[in-house]
């Protein structure tokens, strides 16, 4: 087999493998970005960069939409059919539409500002392994505190705008590698007293705009500079992340029906310490 073909097939394999990693870690509170940075390092592979990582998140975004398609359809239909000019939105699902929109504003605004005014962000020390390790440890402690002090008595019907604003601000911290978008939003929701499984579902739903938009922006930017043959590995990564995301979402929701999140606290703590000791 010619060396060029062998190298190309290996790139496709890496994209497939990293797509699985992306999908599985996107919806667990352990940071997909951190794992997409650390796993290639452990295997001695080149870092495929921010654009690749963001692009294959599209598979995860499509997975959320597919998994929650019935609830999303209900949310959209309720939003456009239940508005009362004198009373506003009283239906739970129509309010959830507003909440998803509000929670998405901070991360989209800050993400745009970083892209416009911090062009070298992808090469900054914040994406280094040391920063990821420290962030992982800090986030594990915050998640532990949310388990200890969160009342966990709120369902979707009890969620208010204040809860969502705090969750949206927390979500913007996910712009920094190692934070974990699902992890920090879950932590915020637990601190607000939201029940675990409801908190996870809310975390997944509010992530749809941010994950979708960032993925599309980076994918379109890659389309402008890459040939069709170079895009194929990215498409492979998107597809594999879709299927692993479906598995991870279902697994996590079932897990939270009977368990707390302390296993992820221990994992993130160990993950951070492992990185620090292997730098």
UniProtKB/Swiss-Prot annotation:
GO terms for molecular function: undecaprenyl-diphosphatase activity. GO terms for biological process: cell wall organization; peptidoglycan biosynthetic process; regulation of cell shape; response to antibiotic. The chain crosses the membrane at residues 10-30, 48-68, 96-116, 128-148, 203-223, 229-249, 259-279. It is an enzyme of class 3 (hydrolase). It is found in: Cell inner membrane. It is a multi-pass membrane protein. GO terms for cellular component: plasma membrane. Bacitracin is thought to be involved in the inhibition of peptidoglycan synthesis by sequestering undecaprenyl diphosphate, thereby reducing the pool of lipid carrier available. Catalyzes the dephosphorylation of undecaprenyl diphosphate (UPP). Confers resistance to bacitracin. Belongs to the UppP family. This is Undecaprenyl-diphosphatase. It comes from Prochlorococcus marinus (strain NATL1A). The gene is uppP.
């Amino acid at each position: 087999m010619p060396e060029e073909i062998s190298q190309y097939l290996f790139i496709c394999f890496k994209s497939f493998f990293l797509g699985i990693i992306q999908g599985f870690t996107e919806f667990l509170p352990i940071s997909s970005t951190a794992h997409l940075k650390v796993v290639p390092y452990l295997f001695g592979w080149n870092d495929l960069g921010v654009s690749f990582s963001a692009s294959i998140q599209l598979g995860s975004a499509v997975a959320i939409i597919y998994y929650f398609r019935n609830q999303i359809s209900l949310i959209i239909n309720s939003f456009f059919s239940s508005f009362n000019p004198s009373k506003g939105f009283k239906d739970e699902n129509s309010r959830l539409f507003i909440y998803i929109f509000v929670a998405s504003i901070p991360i989209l605004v800050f993400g745009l500002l970083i892209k416009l005014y911090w062009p070298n962000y992808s090469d900054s020390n914040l994406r280094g392994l040391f920063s990821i390790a420290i962030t992982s440890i800090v986030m594990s402690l915050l998640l532990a505190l949310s388990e200890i002090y969160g009342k966990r008595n709120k369902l979707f019907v009890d969620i208010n705008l204040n809860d969502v604003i705090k969750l949206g601000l927390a979500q913007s911290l996910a712009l920094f590698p190692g934070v974990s978008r699902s992890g920090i939003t879950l932590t915020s929701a637990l601190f607000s007293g939201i029940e675990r499984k409801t908190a996870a579902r809310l975390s997944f739903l509010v992530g749809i705009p941010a994950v979708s938009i960032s993925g599309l922006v980076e994918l379109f930017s890659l389309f402008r500079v890459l040939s069709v043959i170079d895009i194929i590995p990215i498409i492979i990564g998107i597809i594999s992340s879709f299927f692993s995301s479906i598995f991870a979402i279902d697994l996590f929701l079932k897990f939270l029906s009977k368990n707390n999140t302390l296993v992820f606290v221990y994992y993130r703590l160990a993950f951070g310490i492992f990185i620090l000791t292997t730098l």
